[in-house]
Design a protein with these regions (language model features):
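Pol beta-like nucleotidyltransferase catalytic core
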Residues: 1-22, 28-36, 40-144
Length: 144
């Protein structure tokens, strides 16, 4: 089918950048975290993520076995309840990171974190995928 080419994921921007700022669908105050393909695409393209999303988005990833990069980025924004304050902290985090790292430093940092990026990729396609499928089946069985 020729329409499949339309759905191809462009990866050029992942190959030419260091991290992704992911604008998730949920941003306000929610009782649970729901991550979309926006976050998953960054992860399976070997990118650290800064998530502009609901509170505890990074916590959600960590609880499911993914590595986040609190040693590189200030991830305290993930704990902030107020959406405006959280966005301000994210902007400061990105600004500080960009101001304090040269291209040469980013190349070195990329090499240093590559094993963690590979872990996230393999985890996404491995045990996490199985978790999602099992969770889906459990929810389907619960529908009456």
């Amino acid at each position: 089918n020729d329409n499949w080419a339309y759905h191809k994921i462009c990866t050029d921007h992942y190959d030419t950048s260091f991290f992704s700022i992911v604008n998730e669908s949920q941003y306000g105050t929610y009782s649970h975290c729901y991550l979309t393909e926006k976050t998953w695409k960054a992860i399976f393209n070997f990118h650290p993520v800064i998530i502009v999303g609901a509170k505890h988005s990074l916590k959600y990833l960590k609880e499911r076995g993914f590595d986040t990069f609190g040693d590189i980025f200030d991830e305290s924004y993930d704990e902030i309840e107020d959406g405006n304050e959280r966005l301000d902290r994210i902007l400061n985090t990105v600004g500080n990171f960009l101001e304090n790292n040269t291209k040469t430093q980013l190349v070195d940092l990329r090499k240093k974190i590559l094993p963690r990026l590979i872990h996230n990729y393999e985890h996404f396609w491995g045990s996490f995928r199985d978790y999602v499928i099992d969770d889906f089946h459990t929810k389907i069985k619960g529908i009456k």
